Amino acid sequence: MREMKKIFAGILMTVLLTGCSSQEILSEVPQTIVLPEEQIDSLPTQEEDPTSAETENTESFSLLEEGGSRFAYESLEAPEQIWYLEIEQALGEMEGTVKLSTDPLEQGLDEQDIDKIFQCVMIDHPEIFYATGYTYTKYSRGEKTVGIDFAGSYELTEEEAIVRAEQIRKITADWIRGIGEDKSEYEKVKAVYEQIIFATDYDLNAPDNQNICSVFLEGASVCQGYAKATQYLLNHLGVMCTLVQGTVDTGEAHAWNLVRVDGDYYYVDTTWGDASYRMEDGSEQEGLSEINYDYLCVTTEDILRTHRIEGVVAMPECTAMEANYYVREGNYFTEYNREQLQRIFDAAREMGRTDITLKCADETCYREICRVLIDEQEIFSYIPDSNSTISYAQNGKQLSLTFWVTNE
C-alpha cells in the first residue's frame, strides 16, 4: 500500500467560479433628447422627410445573415416586434437615424422599451459585431410621446464592417466544412464546442472581445466572444442557439448559450469548457484534456449550481438528459459499476487517450465512486502500467471526476 500511495499523485483542482467582468457584457446607455412642444409641429413626418428619397435611391446593403434563430424576437409582444424589425434593419444596414413606427406608442410602448428591444436584436444577431450601442430622440407633445428617432452607434465604417464580415464568412466556411453539415445536432454542438475551445485563448485583453471578431479573427476572447461565436457557427449549421446572459456565483457577469437538440433545450458554456481557463493558476497539466465537458448540453438544475440566469429574455426549463455529453458518451453513472468503468478506460486506451471523465447522477453515487476509486485506490486496477502516476480533478458542483495519467 505504501508504494501505491507514492505513485498516486492526487491533484485536487479548485474550480474557479469566475466569469467575465461586469464591464465585459454589452450595456449601452442611450441619450435622450426631449424637444419642446413648439418644435414638434415643424418636424417633418416620414412622408415629408427629405432624406427618405435619398435613402431609396442609395444602393442598400445588409450585413444580416439568414438562417439564425430569432429566439429573443419570439419572446416579445407584437408592438415590441414592430420596433425590433425596424431596429434590426437599421443595424443590419448601418443606417443613420431612423424613425420608429408610432403604432407601438399608441399601444403603450415608450422610450424605456427601446433598450430591451435593442438587446433582443443583439442577442439574435452575433453578426452585428460592429454595433456598440444606440441613441434616440424622443418627441413629446405635453406628456405624450409622439415620435422617436433611433440611431445605432458603430465602431467601424461600412467599408470596414463589410471587409470583416467577409473575412469571418471565409474562415467559418472552412470550420463548417470541417465539422460537416450532415452530422446529427448533438454532433454539431459537440464539434463547435471543441473547435472554439481548441482555436481560442481566454484573454481579458483580447481586442474586440465582446463580439465574434475576437474568436474568428484574433483567436482570443472572453465569455461573450466565446458564446457569440458558438451561436454564429451553430446557426449556420442549422442548430437553434441563442445567447444567455447572467452572472456566476461570484457575482461576475457571464454569457453562455441555450441550444435545442432533437427538440429539447440544453445549456452550453463554451468558455467554462476550456479546461485551461478553469485552472486555478491558469497552467496546463500534462495528460489532462484541454476540454472540460461538464458544460456541454446540461440541464437548468446543473447550470444553476454555478450560474444565475438574468437578461431580458426568459429561458425555458431544461430537463432533458439525452444529449448531455456524459449520457451520450456512456460516461454517466447512477452507481459504481466496474464493467462500465472498464469499458470507458478501454475505449480511451484504444483512442490513444490518457484521461477519462465521468459524471454521477447524484451525491450518493458521487461519494461512492470517490470512496472506491480515490480513498480505496481502486483506480489502479484500471491502469495496466503499475509505474503510472495518476492525477485526478474533482468538480463537486457538477458531480464529475477526471483521471489522467502523467509521466511524473
For the regions a protein language model found, what residue spans apply to each?
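Alpha-helix capping and helix-loop boundary segments enriched in small/acidic/polar residues
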Residues: 85-87, 159, 217-221, 245
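N-terminal accessory/pre-domain segments preceding catalytic cores
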Residues: 19-182, 299-408
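A short, highly charged nucleic-acid-interacting micro-segment common to nuclease
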Residues: 212-226
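Sec-dependent N-terminal signal peptides of Gram-positive bacterial secreted proteins and lipoproteins
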Residues: 2-25
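Hydrophobic/aromatic-rich core segments of domains that either
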Residues: 225-298
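Secondary-structure boundary elements
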Residues: 160-215
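Short, well-ordered strand-loop elements centered on a beta-strand within folded domains, enriched
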Residues: 146-150, 214, 218, 264-270
